[in-house]
Amino acid sequence: MLNGEKSALGEMPSNSNSSSKLNAKSPNFIPSSSNIPRSSAKTKEHSADRKPHRNSEKKTQGMPRKNQQLASSERKTKNKKRLEKQSSAIADSIGESLDDPQTVYDEHLFDILSARTNKRGQINLNHLLNFQFTPRTNSNAFSAPPRRSRGYNTYGQGSGHHPMDKSRYVNANYRFVVSPIGDYQSQKLDPDSPVKWEDVWQVLCSSDFQLAACPFCLEEKPVAARMSRCGHVYCFSCLLRFVETPTAAEVKAAETSGTKIVKCGHRSCPICWDSIRLRDVHPIRWVEDKEFQKLEEGKSVCLRLYQRNNGSILAFPRSCRSFALDGSFHSDEIPNFTMSGAAYARIIIGSHDYMVQQHLLEIEQLQQIAAEDISLYGSADTYYERITQILLDRISSLSESVNEQNIKSLQTDIDNLCLQSNSLKQLSEVDDLNDVSGSEIADAYLFYQPFAHSHIYLSPLDIRILKSAFGSYENFPDELVPRVERISSGHLVNSELRQRFKYMAHLPEGCEVAFIECDWSKIIPKEVLLTFKSEISKRRKQRKAQEMREERYRQRAERDTEEQIYSELNMQRPVPKTVVHEDPAEAFPTLGSHHQFESTDEVNTDESTLSTAKTVWGTRALANIQNDTDDQDDLDGWKVDWDKVAQLSAPSKNSKNKKKKKLVLLSTGAAHR
């Protein structure tokens, strides 16, 4: 024990020997009856025989007060020794000394001890190695969305609610006229890179297969159409009215506050609930393609051979290559709207004069519609005048910007002239414009399309048939007119599809493409088609099996929909009625009919079939129904067969001593014997 420590039995004498003899934990302790109080000797013996309880609180409660003090002092001593041992081990590891009594109770040393030491007194010295793992960094800018039980994302990329998804959709399905001062190097190298919405001046849409009705007036072809960031199309007059019309909440707030209604500069899209601002909408130009063809299965289609140079995003007909004297087909640059390649480009560089001309066409269209409304209804919409004034202001601002940027436009014109002169020099060195060098052909991709920007291509088997017939892609004819057997649509461009079909590398991701399967019996020789006979027949069988499978799915879906409707309305599904078609000649035979000359057996069979009972609905009744009714008539008591009664009452010859049977008649109310 430590010096100066008080014993658990009370005040101890100054003599250490006597104190050690009285201390139960001391090795000099001598048990005797004199050392134990008489009153507690019996209790001490019983407590020594019993096993210690697990719970320390119950153990201390059962002990005398003096023994409780002894146990508490023992615990303090053990804890103190353990701390001293751990602190000494830590001091040895870090090179400190415990000679100073303050070092044992140093707070810093105790913190190190509690952090580095386990229950067994072992010390972790990894901090002395000066080794540390590099922190994990996420290479992606956006973290992955949380995993959900549903199979689709509710937000983020791929859900349709993310701005990037909408910009990718617009980038994949439309063409653009962009500002001449923008930087489009990323779009030339990567078709998936969307054009900045601020650089877009006009959106080009096909009037043949990209018409979108206005969600407000339901006009099939919107007037002075405008497109928002989300890709939805509206009439300019409808959109302006929608934005400027206050909502019920705004009117109520203005009435309560006693102020004017504040005009809101934005509204939510009625289709996708995305924010719409008037400054973010861009005009739309409806483009009509003279080469447009509506594809139908079983009809012929004219296919043109298109060419795309390696690394370029411009695909053009190979037959038009010799007529492009402006160099648009010989350069990888984005063409201007005046070049020949602008009709086949997805991104076109515009000019202020071009936009002024387009705005004037919109004003002319609005005036024509206003005149029609006045002739029909007596008045025109006031928003037509508002839109006309907005377009006139836009034209004036464009004219001012043209005057300010004369130097820049002059420089661009000089660059275009230099480019055209270089292309003319290059073309003049070539004797035959139709002959293309082998290096250019090796770097170019050839494919068939019905018309520009149609995204309709031949299936892989058809391409193999053509290559087997013509030898190589360079020998393909510029035009082919096969018969379409099947159209497979709904394929989206992705990395897999690009890896499989190299000629689709210029299409942006998310673009929808279709493949057609054609009948080449009138174009390709029969000897070539015989080599692919098994594959063609297999493809046709698969097509028929798919059609049957789709028909079964359609019928099943219709049946499930009907069942759901009947279950929601708590109605029972009606049972289809069986309609019996009868020949009037058989139902009403005439005297001169040919049935009179038939055999008696056939007549009997016909009579038996005609005599069968039928229900009031025209269906055939069961044969035993009539017999059952006859039995019931016999048992009702009102129709008695007296001949049968006489036979039963007459005595039989063989029965001499037998008792006669008595007949019970039910003609009266009670039975009489």
Swiss-Prot record:
GO biological process: positive regulation of transcription by RNA polymerase II
Keyword line: Cytoplasm, Metal-binding, Nucleus, Zinc, Zinc-finger
Broad class of where this protein is predominantly found: cytoplasm
PROSITE patterns assigned to the protein according to its UniProt record, in alphabetical order: ZF_RING_1 (PS00518), ZF_RING_2 (PS50089)
Biased composition (Basic and acidic residues): 42-60
Stretch list, region Disordered: 1-95, 649-673
Zn finger intervals (RING-type): 214-273
Biased composition (Low complexity): 13-40
MF terms in GO: transcription cis-regulatory region binding; ubiquitin-like protein ligase activity; zinc ion binding
Gene3D superfamilies registered for this protein in UniProt: Zinc/RING finger domain, C3HC4 (zinc finger) (3.30.40.10)
Gene Ontology CC annotations of this record: cytoplasm; cytosol; nucleus
Xref: SUPFAM superfamilies: RING/U-box
Transmembrane segments: none
Subcellular location: Cytoplasm; Nucleus
Pfam families, per the entry: zf-C3HC4
Protein name, UniProt field: Uncharacterized RING finger protein P8B7.23
